Amino acid sequence: MLPAGTGVDAAALPLAHAPLPASDVVSGSPTAATVALGEIRGVEVGVWEMTPGTACDREADEVFVVMSGRARIAFLEPALPSIEVGPGSIVRLAEGMRTEWTVTETLRKVYVA
């Protein structure tokens, strides 16, 4: 929990990575880590990171800002054009979207969900 009136360096925050479920992995051996920093009026704020590889996910309702790294996000359900993301990208995801993340450089994002 990040107490009010304090700050954290999101780029340097240590994260404990774990392998993604084999059923989600399309290629490579990606790992991911999340740390929740707290909630604001019931909305979680945190940092998430994924190492290179390709994996599918069922999304939560969230907005995120990419801090570092690069990836392509393919929208499988609903079918939408893929997007390329990198430092400074701001992306909106909706609950239930099915995505495929192809991370080419370890991707770290700050999310609000």
Regions found by a protein language model. Give the residues of each.
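A short, N-terminal "cap"/entry segment at the start of jelly-roll beta-barrel domains
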Residues: M1-V47
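Short acidic, glycine-rich loop/turn motifs
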Residues: E39, F75-E77
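Short, surface-exposed beta-strand-loop junctions and turns on beta-sheet-rich folds
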Residues: V63, A79-P81, R108
